[in-house]
């Protein structure tokens, strides 16, 4: 079940250290999309908390990794999470630490710093409803050995994808899509990153509907 990803304690004590952070607090930037439109660096997770108060997260994977040192074996938790507002923004991150909560906090921080806008649309030739329930065109993303292809689907199709991809797509606000996957999709982090990279590519092309805006 998705849970709130907002770090209220950190947000309450947040003192911006970057120019973008100061612009957000001063009201000169009022949306996360504005940051991406202006190609500004996103270096503080509190910026995401501030601009997306409805941000949620879902845990994708928890594992224990071991490292052999002179002192013996050291075990640490590795947590993989996806964050999103279910309305056009999504990010994936991982964190390692001896304690689970510390690893979770690191994963959430990384996911927020890796958040990306997602262009939604109705790109299937079988559907012309015009609602942003799918993606506008076919996109591909890669991470490690994993390659993911996302294809627009008509309304009512649902998310035809594996569990990891479904969680990422839901957090992005995508309701209908077909997927093709290649490579070692059992590697949760790479699978999730490949999906996010595919969604990020929805903004690498200017669709006809955006010609007048460009």
From Swiss-Prot:
Keyword Transcription part of the UniProt annotation: no
GO terms of molecular function: rRNA binding; structural constituent of ribosome
Keyword terms, alphabetized: Ribonucleoprotein, Ribosomal protein, RNA-binding, rRNA-binding
Keyword RNA-binding in record: yes
InterPro entries linked to this entry: Ribosomal_Su5_D2-typ_SF, Ribosomal_uS5, Ribosomal_uS5_arc, Ribosomal_uS5_C, Ribosomal_uS5_euk/arc, Ribosomal_uS5_N, Ribosomal_uS5_N_CS, Ribsml_uS5_D2-typ_fold_subgr
GO cellular component: cytosolic small ribosomal subunit
Sequence ranges assigned to domain S5 DRBM in this UniProt record: 55-118
GO biological process: translation
Protein family (similarity comment): Belongs to the universal ribosomal protein uS5 family.
Self-association state and partner proteins as the record states: Part of the 30S ribosomal subunit. Contacts protein S4.
Entry remark concerning the domains of this protein: The N-terminal domain interacts with the head of the 30S subunit; the C-terminal domain interacts with the body and contacts protein S4. The interaction surface between S4 and S5 is involved in control of translational fidelity.
NCBIfam families for this protein: PRK04044.1, uS5_euk_arch
Function text: With S4 and S12 plays an important role in translational accuracy.
Name the UniProt record assigns to this protein: Small ribosomal subunit protein uS5
Organism (species): Staphylothermus marinus (strain ATCC 43588 / DSM 3639 / JCM 9404 / F1)
Gene assigned in the entry: rps5
